[in-house]
Amino acid sequence: MYMKHFLILLLSFVLMSNVAFAQDSKEESKSKTVEFMAGCGSLMKKEFYDLPKVKGVVNQVLIITNVLTGKKVGCLSVETSYYNGRSSDSYIGTLDYEELDACVKSLTYIKDELLLSTPDVYTEVEYKTLDNLKLGAFYSKSRWTAFIYTKGYTSRSAEFLDSSNIATFIEVMNQAKSMIADKTK
């Protein structure tokens, strides 16, 4: 009798713990910069260079130097914030240097072609980085809305942009690309 109750209790615990751990499943980052930063047994120097803010999005170039080997990598760091009545959270996503060209092309397409169209159905486009940062736009209720999610697994990391913000974001990405190339020589 006790064994039956024990087994039921144990089975319930195992099932509940699986449900609890499945609630917030964050995707692992595949970013080369994030991977480089996580290196153990190395002394890392991180330098943050401010770029213009776009609406509520904070942009910085991050240059990471392995002091022991002299190797450097850089990325565009993008931060959004979420406020509820009691507290705030910040979410940071990255675009590796190698991703900036494709992202600029994607945003240019959204700005120059997509936002000028009027689809008959709900339409969405999205560019996703190795660090799970998402940029895109969707057409709903007869208008386009651009967005950025610094962490694709949570809507709390979202910032919605006006079409004019897209051009500014493209400029910021081009500045970041030039700065990273210059600082990682």
Predicted stretch roles:
Residues 20-185:
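Positively charged, low-complexity terminal tracts
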Residues 5-6, 24:
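Intrinsic disorder/low-complexity segments enriched in polar/small residues
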Residues 1-3:
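N-terminal secretory signal peptides that target proteins for export/translocation
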Residues 6-16:
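Sec-dependent N-terminal signal peptides
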